[in-house]
Amino acid sequence: MNVPGGPTPAEVMAVSLLKLGVRSGDVAADLGCGTGTVTREIAKTASYVYAVDAREIAVSCTKETCAGLPVEIIEGEVTDFLSRPHRKIDCAFLGGSRNLAETLTLLAEEGTRSIVVNAVLLETACLAIETMKRLGIFSDALHLQVSRSYELTKRTMFKPINPVYIIHGENTC
């Protein structure tokens, strides 16, 4: 299935998950789960994962990607999900920018230990940084540019993938 905005490139996912710092026994959330590839990787360590997306195609794709894993897949707005009763979320990955400031606020208020936002737009990265700073949870931001090799006339050349901003927040409360 082709889900707009995904899947997250493996190299970007590796750095994002390192920053997220999922621990054994954690309850995690992939908010704006897209294809479910990040959800699947988080589920390898976390004891339980919420995967939330408002797009029907994303939910369908995540169900396929995460079959048999400890993942609860929810179709709907992230802010609606966070506003209703759920297990306390230890770490959250945000792959989408819909209602970003409100989502970050809800996660910070809940006491989510670690939050990672991936953004391809500068404006989204700025909003994430500004919101995290206002909430007192901003840790750091990365601008990641990855290039992959490919063969060209029996030689090796590199082709860049789109750069990504990785914004990390930690809640010490």
Task: Map each language-model feature to its residues.
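Conserved class I S-adenosyl-L-methionine
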Residues: 25-34
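Class I SAM-dependent transferase core
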Residues: 1-23, 61-64
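A short, conserved alpha-helix within the catalytic core of class I
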Residues: 99-107
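Conserved SAM-binding loop of SAM-dependent methyltransferases across substrates and taxa
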Residues: 35-46
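Conserved SAM-binding motif I beta-strand of class I
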Residues: 48-53
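Core SAM-dependent methyltransferase catalytic element
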Residues: 155-173
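C-terminal substrate-binding/active-site "lid" region of AdoMet-derived donor-dependent transferases
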Residues: 108-161
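S-adenosyl-L-methionine
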Residues: 54-86, 91
